[in-house]
Amino acid sequence: MSIFTDLNTSRKWQIDQWLSAVNSHIEKIQQYGHSVVNPTPLLADGFEIKTQSPVVWQFPDGHDAPISNFASQQNWLRLLISMSVITETEKYRHLAFCQSEYFLNRFVDENSGLFYWGGHRFINLDTLASEGPESKSMVHELKHHLPYYEFLHQVNPEKTRHFIQGFWNAHVEDWSCLDLGRHGDYARQRDPDVFLHSRHDVVTPANWPELPLTKGLTFVNAGTDLIYAAFVYARHTGDAHAAAWGKHLYRQYVLARNPETGMPVYQFSSPLQRQPVPADDNQTQSWFGDRAQRQFGPEFGAIAREANVLFRDMRPLLIDNPLAMLDILRHQPDAEILTWVIAGLKNYYQYAYDVNSNSLRPMWNNGQDMTDYCFKRDGYYGKAGTVLKPFPLEGDYLLPLVRAWLLSDDDDLHTLIVTMLSRLEKQGIHQSASPFLLLAITELAHAKQSAQWAEYAWQMAEILFKRYFHHGLFVRSEHHRYVRLDDPFPAILLTLIAACRNKWSEVPAVLTQGGYIHGDYRINGESRVIYDTEFIYPEKLIH
């Protein structure tokens, strides 16, 4: 019995309104999301609310392609499955199954096992051709996509297993030094024995601050998806080698942490310099060597490594990676991994969290505060003259802390959660409200059986519902131009409803903000590199 179950009766009218809204959202996407010229079960990643035209990628050569990127529709699948669970009707699950089955039967590379999807590749909704930004060569990339493997495995177990084999095989360039990269080659033949490679640590803490030199960029956002996939593979096949490889890869990020502070790293290697460093500081390709050392080395010395930078977007390290690891541990408990996850979070916040301003200090992972530092030269991290400022602590950062506490009952985490919540409450619920914060508070209320936090979660859900539900769809606001299928809020709202209906454990966990496409895009006749999530979907309506 959940603290939320009483609400199922006392506020039934509100729950019914929310479910009606989610149903409207799903029906409108089904009505307008398919191709008009060549209807199939595939859906556009999003469409214009006024015209119902699909979101397109504008290529620099002048042609436009309506985007259907299955990797950017995994939260949509979670939404459909959650709706079937809560309403006890199969029609939503059937929609998810038909769409997934159609994709898996037609858009899988037989050689590599990889799907035609991801950060640099999608299916043209009208022609069904595989397309992608030319500058990215349509390579395979997943960065915190965390696909809904549980459901994909139900639809087609063999192709899901083959994908994970191909995913690891295509992204690990050299197993002897664990040289891996965010880009995978579709030309690499799938290896069914991919997890039988021998394992040895490539990071030696005694050599710190020196890290292995690799051609590939061992970014944590790319590594997280590999780790997550390996554990899913182990769960469905019983292959202990896959789980061992997932843990081994995560261990390299742990070994690369600062030995004094224990603060985490963005990657466990430094880019190998393969070409002479150019005079132009704006040429920041990784083959010129470590970009942080090049831009900041003269001032900061050995600590200036890409791995040690904690002054750019912290979501991959503090939200996305911990959420993936904690979801793994929910299914496959491992005390050592849990200790690693919690240590990374606690050590970071010990040094970087400013309670008074409720913000995160920009830092090197040796604990050196970079607040107000002015860049001396151009480079990978920004232009000369850039001044670093603290990052406001958004409510999203609370979700992994809550989930880590739920698995560990760690007193320090609980203290940190209470402190952050008190600071967020002072901002006011309207200002602090976000989908991930709603999820965090819902899970906290459920765990503590707290009527106070259950009521707070309910109030936040009402605020977010009014903010996001317009035109019969869940959108960023009534002023935004596009609906986006991978928006997590509808699925998060269903998580709250599931708690009210005692179906908490039956709905899929929400783990990610969704997928993206990244590459060259035509803007006013010129080519610019964009993310669709940062350039297309934030567009407002033109009145």
From Swiss-Prot:
This is Pectate disaccharide-lyase. The gene is pelW. Keywords: Copper, Cytoplasm, Lyase, Manganese, Nickel. Gene3D superfamilies: 1.50.10.20. Catalyzes the formation of unsaturated digalacturonates from polygalacturonate or short oligogalacturonates. Its cofactor is Cu cation; Mn(2+); Ni(2+). The keyword Ion transport does not apply. It comes from Dickeya dadantii (strain 3937). Induction: By galacturonate and PGA, and inhibited by EDTA. It is found in: Cytoplasm. It is an enzyme of class 4 (lyase). Its main location: cytoplasm. Its EC number is 4.2.2.9. Pathway: Glycan metabolism; pectin degradation. GO terms for biological process: pectin catabolic process. The keyword Manganese applies. It catalyses: [(1->4)-alpha-D-galacturonosyl](n) = 4-(4-deoxy-alpha-D-galact-4-enuronosyl)-D-galacturonate + [(1->4)-alpha-D-galacturonosyl](n-2). One of its GO terms (molecular function) is carbon-oxygen lyase activity, acting on polysaccharides. Belongs to the polysaccharide lyase 2 family. One of its GO terms (cellular component) is cytoplasm.
